[in-house]
């Protein structure tokens, strides 16, 4: 926020029928149902975001809308001149999905993951996701 960076937040957004989806069957934990308390951003996170931050609602692990938004910056500034830094939850589900989607669409765009600003479902799956991202040329910082 203080550096004037563009801030884009993805936000899990599910419907009441979440448990009937493939994700809901395999991850039977109702979460982020639109317009519920659990769907809202944490107050501290909201306070840290600038007023002009973009919030992308995503019903899946990775966001195709995020790809389009990043694509606008890539078109304007060039792939190597756009740098993405990723933080968030869950490292082993949504974070790794978004990182790899962006890397697939923009292989020359530098992507950094700040591991201290992420958390996985378990410490082991968090570490596995970090290892996966490193193997796919995502720059991982603060992992130790």
What would you call each of these model-derived segments?
Residues 2-6, 15-16, 21-144:
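Active-site-adjacent betaalpha module
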Residues 11:
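Catalytic-core segment of enzymes that process non-peptidic bonds
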């Amino acid at each position: 926020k203080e550096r004037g960076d563009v801030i884009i937040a993805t936000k899990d957004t599910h419907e009441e029928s979440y448990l009937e989806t493939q994700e809901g069957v395999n991850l039977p934990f109702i979460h982020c149902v639109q317009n519920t308390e659990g769907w809202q951003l944490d107050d501290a996170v909201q306070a840290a975001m600038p007023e002009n931050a973009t919030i992308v609602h995503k019903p899946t692990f990775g966001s195709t809308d995020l790809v389009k938004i990043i694509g606008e910056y890539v078109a304007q500034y060039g792939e190597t001149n756009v740098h993405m830094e990723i933080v968030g939850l869950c490292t082993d589900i949504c974070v790794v999905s978004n990182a790899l989607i962006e890397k697939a669409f923009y292989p020359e765009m530098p992507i950094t993951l700040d591991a201290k600003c992420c958390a996985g479902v378990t410490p082991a799956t968090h570490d596995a996701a970090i290892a996966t991202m490193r193997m796919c040329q995502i720059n991982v910082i603060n992992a130790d």
